[in-house]
Amino acid sequence: MEEWDGDVFTWNAGKEDIYTLIESILRLLKNGCKGMENMVVKYLGTGATDSLYMYFPWLRGRDLESRLSVEHQIDRFWKIRFELHEERTNSMDRYEDIVSSFLALDTKCGILGKLEGQMALVDEIRRIYSITSQGSPRKKRLREYRLHGTLCLHPGAGSMRLYASLFSLDATVKEIIFPEIEIFPSSTFPILVPLRTDRGVSRIIYKKGDDLTRDLFVLETIRYMSRLMGVDLVTYKVIPLSRKEGIVEVVDGIDFTRIRSRKDLEMYIEEDRDPRHQESFEKRKVFVSTLCGYSVACYVMGIGDRNPGNMMVTRDGKFFHIDFSHVFGRDPKPISSRITIARPIRDYLVNDELIYQDFLARSGEAFLQIRRSCRKIFVLWCILAQNRIFQFDLNEIIPFAQARLRMEMSEQRALELFEKEIRGAVGSLKTSVAHLINRVGMFLRR
């Protein structure tokens, strides 16, 4: 198999036993087979300058300059920094190659100044979080008192300073909006930090106590699944700083702790428009298609701890999930359903038979598309798993996904069982109980 060219690679990838294929891919990746990355990218159907290139371990320095944009080079910096921070990359040659690579990039596009500004912003956000966590209070209000009390006693803490944006390469952060910092009443009490930039206000979340490398793995997979399904699924960026710390990009939208009824949902995504209007129809269509896409993605990867706080919808009607701390069946709530449909969404679907049937049909189509393309997803996972930043065992996650996709059955039988699963998710008693428990927990932490 080491003699594959692009066409032979495609044929073997489609015909071989999945485990033989995985073993061959891993061997080729480990040996750094010349041109392997181009064959894999061609097989996966991704762009020539796709961010996937930064996950090939043997590509270094000049090999990456023409393949990655400046934005992806910065993403690569944070990945490499993580690996060095975790002391999992001990080769001095590797370190020198990294330094030389970024010095060359700095000459071309001034990348080091941007990185310095980003790191200064990270240090300031860490300082803010440390104020809220002094004494480790288990109440949101106590943490807020500490933060705003410090700002009152030391008004200079909120003084203006220029930083580089972490997620918008061309934006400059002019100010951290200290009075509007929020603390979430979840178990690790992450903070939401508003930033005033030269392009408007953006927001980021700082988390401590969560491993955001799982989120990164899931989001890379969802981006690829989005292409396979032909549905524009919302994703966002994350920067894991360590195994227990990281920063998350905030996508504008509203979560389902604030959408508590069908009427709330209709008002948000339809804006009180006449349902006969084309714009309203398109937004409903977008909502249903993205709901189906995310439902299938979360089902296949066994994403757990789904609650109203980590399900969101954008103003243009796109549904999406956030917070992927528990994946591949490792759900802290054993009573949870394998597909979670929040109550307002359930009521929205069953209120209109046409919308409900459209949801069932689109979910089935998305499931079949992922099932038919599962080999490509597994090849993507092989590439990601070669990076030290991720700690997933392919011998666990691939069989898990195969079981969810019911690869041992005929396509028709697998679809029938999935349709039964998705029908059961609408109005699931397990979901109602799990969400009630989550609300009680959040109330106790306020």
From Swiss-Prot:
Which is one Pfam family of this protein? Answer: PI3_PI4_kinase
Q: Which InterPro entries match?
A: Kinase-like_dom_sf, PI3/4_kinase_cat_dom, PI3/4_kinase_cat_sf, PI_Kinase
Which GO molecular function terms does the record list?
1-phosphatidylinositol-3-kinase activity; ATP binding
Q: How does it sit in the membrane?
A: Peripheral membrane protein
**What class does this enzyme belong to in the EC scheme?**
transferase
Q: Name one GO biological process term.
A: phosphatidylinositol-mediated signaling
Region (G-loop) location: 183-189
Q: Which family does it belong to?
A: Belongs to the PI3/PI4-kinase family.
Q: What's this protein's function?
A: Phosphatidylinositol 3-kinase required for cytoplasm to vacuole transport (Cvt) and autophagy as a part of the autophagy-specific VPS34 PI3-kinase complex I. Also involved in endosome-to-Golgi retrograde transport as part of the VPS34 PI3-kinase complex II.
What protein name applies here? Probable phosphatidylinositol 3-kinase VPS34 homolog
